[in-house]
Amino acid sequence: MPATLDPEGTAGAERGASAASDRAPRPPEPGLARCAGTCHALFVFDIGYEVDLEAARQRLSAFGHGRRFRHRSATHTASQEQSFPLVFEQSVGAEGLAEVLPLPFVRPLPEVLISVYPSGALSVAWRLPFERSFEELIALSSALYDDQSLERVSRRIAAEVQQSLGDSVERPRLAQDFEDYFAFHLPEPPRGWQPAAEALWASSGARGGQERALARLLRAERSELSEQEVSDALSQSISYAPGEVVFVDWSAALLLGADVADELFVLELATVELLELRVLDGKLYRGIEEAYEILSRRGHFLRNLAPLGGDLARIARIQADQALLHEGVDNPLKLFGDDYLARLYRAAQERFHFGEWDAAIERKLETLDSIHQKLSDLASTRRSEILEWIIILLIAFEIVMSLAEKLA
């Protein structure tokens, strides 16, 4: 006989399964998920034209050491490694920590990591350990974005290091311009989140709560973001191994993985390059103003006939200095023998708009060259005018002498 169905038994089994499902622990909301890690707050300053790292190393011999890529397969020549910074730790001290305004949920470690670059850049890296909910981490990101106390203390540390380096810094000057960047490192995904990195950076489909929370962290935004803003915030992501991913945005990054020392180094190098591009752009702007002032300068007759050799030499020096700086700005970033690190750098390059900065600098260099050429033409014209006046005076002198002889 065919087996008879037992509706009551089936319904009971379904009710039992439903009850068991209700009793099973549900994953927390993305914002409530707990996470532990470290926020690396980076501040980069320009302390001079360039730094002699060998001389700086001798001055800091007690605690300075070089910095290298540690775990990836990047290979470098000896000449390339000269572009790597000199790194050392320095205690902030109780007074320095007291100057830092209270940040939500974290307290900085009392030591900062300082890196001195041959290009004249100096970075101060703070480490802020945390173990909080992701929503609280977003609040920390927003507070760091608005905070000025860390930058103020970092600038004072940079000035002290600049003084300690002495004559190893050529043309020392602590510029007002600076760059900051915040990298949030999570050794493991927040509890209850999907562990696979690929699930976090899918580029299509509706964005879920995890993606929205990530975007708010990167944009330091307490309120909800639009779908378009979320997609843009997560558009630059790099993954090396299952369970590892790096999201790169213009002011912050999220690094998911156990060991991210190399990734942090690449992001620091990119931030250093961004500052150098900004400083170079400012120097070129001031150089153009100075050159234009020389070109448009007017005075009395004799002043207009004065030679322009000194002015031409000054503009030529500005051109040479800035062209050399522009050529050397990205030297530390031409060192990647590892494709993964190169891809990470390209993601940062895209986020920081290096292409636009390079184009603006090239235009300013061309403008400076154009002014130099016009000034050179003006100098040639003045030389011709001076020669003409000399000839006129000689002719007049001959006429006067002839008349004087006849009258005598």
Residue ranges and their predicted role:
Residues H71-S73, E151-R155, L275-E276, G282-Y285, ...:
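Short, surface-exposed, polar/charged, turn-prone segments marking secondary-structure boundaries
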Residues L255-E289:
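Switch/coupling subdomain of P-loop NTPase systems
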Residues V279-E405:
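Membrane-associated alpha-helical segments
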Residues S226-P242, F265-L277, G310-L324:
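Short charge-dense sequence patches
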Residues P2-E244:
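Short Lys/Arg-enriched alpha/beta "domain-start" segment
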